[in-house]
């Protein structure tokens, strides 16, 4: 695990007295990866984002799904099933937050992927394509959707280690 340094932004979360029953949030924090170096603080950041959703945005906790160390199946199947089961989506809002590895496609610079915790960095195409992810989110037809990606998509982590095994970063 990581030694967390907290700041005021983590603890002095503004509180609103508004309740937004028609807003939902899918919050994903991928920190501990099976095949590639981890993403320090991703779970912590996801938990803090969830807390902001509850306290500041007034989203009821039952309208928020927090996924920690999400596998491809968890994200593609379980979480999208949860979103699909929300009725009257055309009158509701969705917020999606992802903290974790983003991986570029080494063959096509116009493609990028979110890396679930059970996918190898050598085959980013086995991850979750951003184009497909945005398409699926759009097909859900919420009234409004906001997506926050806390991922760099360079293929290199903070320690200059490659997420795409067999490659390394340069300075």
Whereabouts are the PLM-identified features?
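Boundary/activation segment at the start of structured domains
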Residues: 1-112
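Alpha-helical scaffolding within the catalytic cores
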Residues: 8-13, 131-132, 170
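Caspase-like (clan CD) cysteine peptidase catalytic core
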Residues: 22, 76-99, 103-162
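Short, intrinsically disordered, charge-balanced linker/junction segments flanking boundaries
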Residues: 165-171
């Amino acid at each position: 695990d990581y030694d967390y340094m907290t700041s005021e932004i983590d603890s002095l979360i503004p509180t609103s007295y508004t309740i937004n029953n028609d807003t939902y949030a899918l919050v994903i924090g991928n920190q501990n990866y099976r095949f590639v170096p981890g993403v320090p603080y991703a779970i912590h950041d996801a938990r803090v984002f969830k807390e902001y959703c509850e306290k500041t945005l007034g989203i009821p906790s039952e309208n928020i799904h927090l996924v920690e160390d999400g596998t491809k199946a968890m994200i593609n199947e379980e979480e999208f099933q949860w979103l699909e089961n929300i009725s009257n989506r055309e009158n509701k809002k969705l917020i999606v937050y992802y903290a974790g590895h983003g991986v570029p496609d080494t063959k096509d610079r116009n493609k990028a992927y979110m890396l679930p915790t059970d996918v190898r960095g050598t085959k980013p195409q086995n991850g979750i394509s951003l184009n497909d992810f945005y398409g699926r989110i759009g097909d859900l037809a919420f009234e409004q959707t906001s997506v926050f990606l806390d991922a760099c998509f360079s293929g290199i982590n903070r320690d200059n280690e490659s997420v795409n095994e067999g490659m390394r970063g340069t300075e």
